[in-house]
Amino acid sequence: MTEITDRYFNDVIARLSGLRDRLAAQMEKAADLIAAAARADRRVYVFGTGHSHMMAEELHYRAGGLAITVPILCGSIMLQDGAVASSHFERIEGAVRPILDRYGIRDGDVLVVVSNSGVNAAPIEAARYAREKGAAIIALTSVAYSNTIARGRTQLLSLADVVLDNDAPSGDAVLEIAGSALKVGPVSTALGVTILNAVFADVAARLVGEGDAPIYLSANMPGSGDINRSLVERYRDRNPHL
């Protein structure tokens, strides 16, 4: 490794080690909410804009993932249809309600809202929408970053039932480069994916113990075709992305 790649690995590993202990109670609370939704045949929706939408894709139709998970995906809040436009769109009040209306979020569901800054209009609106519908809210955000830039604005962390603080610094990037004021090496994705997969693994373990764990297999594993087809048929009525 070069010096800077070594620093990046060390930073991410140190943050993950700290999160494992510091977030233990909050992760257990998040798993409680998701497991309760699974037992009641409810759904767990995952919403994020910009790069945060990758969390929704990560948990959707995933080998080793839960079939109760529904990603909220729309080109206008993602990056592939125009990154600059998407960054503008996520700041417009009222813009995401029509997107959320397509999914049928209801009482007993869970909405995971992912936003590193936790202050843009889209994640705030998503959390308020979930509250209106009677769904529980899990926020994955950077508390430090959000507190730094809030300046009186509503913060996602104030609207959630459970807050998962990803420990990303303000601005996300962690590596200074000699001779430059710029930083590189964003960490929020690596930290966020690890946190959410750990929570969902906890939920899966509980459901296995209770005899009903709707877990997808990798498409290349023996027997995966029948298992995955059965899960798709069971859950596709409330997941438009299957």
From Swiss-Prot:
Disulfide bonds: none annotated. Signal peptide: none annotated. NCBIfam families: PRK02947.1. Belongs to the UPF0309 family. Residues 30-214 form the SIS domain. GO terms for biological process: carbohydrate derivative metabolic process. This is UPF0309 protein BCAN_B0929. GO terms for molecular function: carbohydrate derivative binding. It comes from Brucella canis (strain ATCC 23365 / NCTC 10854 / RM-666). It holds the Pfam family SIS_2. Gene3D superfamilies: Glucose-6-phosphate isomerase like protein, domain 1 (3.40.50.10490). InterPro entries: RpiR-like_SIS, SIS_dom, SIS_dom_sf, SIS_GmhA/DiaA_subfam, UPF0309.
